[in-house]
């Protein structure tokens, strides 16, 4: 989650030879989120390197006024999002409509900045980041004003899923 490893293999980008290709400007966007199309929980990563991806990894470029892309990244990678998407859609496929239906709390720029600092630490860290994941997940949970019982329900429902994929 949050970041991706540097690739070891490459495909020559010749879109005219490919079966299915998004417009080049989407791949080459200054900032975008890449997400795993198939999986038990949502897995989003931030890209500001104009990275190309295969079709098993979809692209979303959030344009929500007043919301920073890394704040949206944190919310979409949260246990709340995983729980919501699992319970509402009962699918291993993560569709754009699923993402668009997920409510993202409106918070101040200052609060977003605190979350973004943690996201940046996760993206840039090579060390064990489990504690950062947990801390960030707790921060996101608090935005939804969930009770202890609701939080416990979410964690119990996701207990068999790997929520903390290694970043590097």
Regions found by a protein language model. Give the residues of each.
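Polybasic, glycine- and aromatic-enriched phosphate-binding surface used to engage nucleic acids
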Residues: 1-113
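Non-catalytic DNA-recognition/assembly elements of restriction-modification systems
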Residues: 106-168
């Amino acid at each position: 989650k949050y970041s991706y490893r540097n690739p070891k293999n490459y495909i020559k980008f010749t879109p005219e030879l490919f079966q299915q290709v998004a417009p080049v400007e989407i791949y080459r966007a200054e900032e975008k989120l890449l997400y795993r199309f198939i999986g038990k929980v949502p897995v989003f990563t931030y890209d500001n390197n104009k990275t190309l991806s295969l079709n098993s990894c979809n692209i979303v470029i959030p344009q929500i006024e007043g919301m920073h892309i890394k704040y949206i990244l944190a919310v979409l990678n949260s246990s709340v999002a995983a729980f919501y998407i699992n319970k509402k859609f009962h699918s291993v496929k993560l569709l754009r409509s699923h993402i668009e239906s997920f409510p993202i709390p409106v918070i101040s720029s200052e609060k977003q900045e605190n979350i973004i600092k943690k996201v940046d630490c996760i993206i840039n860290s090579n060390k064990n980041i489990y504690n950062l994941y947990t801390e960030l997940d707790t921060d996101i949970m608090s935005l939804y004003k969930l009770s202890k019982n609701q939080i416990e329900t979410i964690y119990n429902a996701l207990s068999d899923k790997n929520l903390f994929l290694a970043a590097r």
